[in-house]
């Protein structure tokens, strides 16, 4: 998930959401071949946890993915982890800086050794920690595949209308907090700021989404 215009152009103008395109291709294959394995192509259920749930949240708002699955399960991930174009451009710029390659040089980007790409990716995550809600590499809004933020598509009734099971995994945050001193040191104000990056805006009644979600978590996990 790296919004690089040069790579998109080299693919005939395809959007930069190559990760989502891979998932859509896999779902198309499953739908086309499910019957051969005794399955029902009209009853496909997708299940994702953490980043997998975030991707499903994006697919639910992608018109091209409509009809490929009939129900979905999202655990510890939501439809809010998608970059607007300006945030995706920021991640792209920092990644190219770390890799030492111009964002306009598609050939050099494709030729970069895997080890260098992975090392640059790790440095980007660290550089942008605290500036952007992790993970830094996420799907992004584009005109071809994901025309709007999924959370907005849900609010407007434009996301896929299928049965959903949504939940969280108990104590999952501890896994991330172990390796993130900043997360372990969060106070109430810092927690609110972090949620505001992930859930900007307000509900129809004018209350910030971030504050509402924090209240819901506290009410469900007393003590």
Question: Which residues does each PLM region occupy?
Answer:
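Serine-hydrolase-like catalytic core of hydrolytic proteins
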Residues: 1-103, 123, 154-180
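Acidic, glycine-rich loop-and-strand cores that form catalytic or ligand-binding grooves
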Residues: 113
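Substrate-gating cap/lid region and adjacent catalytic-acid/histidine neighborhood
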Residues: 116-223
């Amino acid at each position: 998930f790296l919004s690089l215009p040069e790579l998109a152009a080299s693919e005939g103008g395809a959007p930069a959401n190559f990760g989502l395109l891979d998932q859509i291709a896999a779902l198309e294959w499953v739908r086309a071949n499910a019957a051969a394995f005794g399955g029902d192509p009209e009853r496909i259920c997708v299940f994702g946890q953490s980043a997998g749930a975030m991707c499903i949240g994006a697919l639910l708002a992608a018109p091209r993915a409509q009809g490929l699955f009939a129900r979905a399960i999202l655990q510890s991930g939501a439809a809010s982890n998608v970059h607007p174009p300006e945030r995706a451009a920021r991640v792209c710029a920092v990644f190219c800086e770390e890799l030492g390659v111009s964002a306009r040089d598609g050939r050099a980007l494709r030729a970069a050794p895997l080890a260098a790409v992975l090392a640059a990716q790790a440095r980007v995550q660290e550089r942008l920690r605290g500036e952007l809600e992790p993970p830094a590499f996420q799907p992004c809004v584009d005109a071809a595949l994901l025309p709007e933020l999924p959370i907005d598509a849900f609010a407007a009734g434009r996301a896929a209308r299928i049965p959903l099971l949504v939940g969280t995994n108990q104590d999952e945050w501890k896994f991330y907090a172990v390796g993130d001193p900043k997360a372990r040191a969060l106070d109430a104000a810092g927690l609110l700021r972090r949620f505001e990056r992930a859930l900007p805006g307000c509900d129809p009644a004018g209350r910030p989404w971030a504050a509402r979600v924090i209240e819901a978590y506290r009410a469900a996990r007393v003590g």
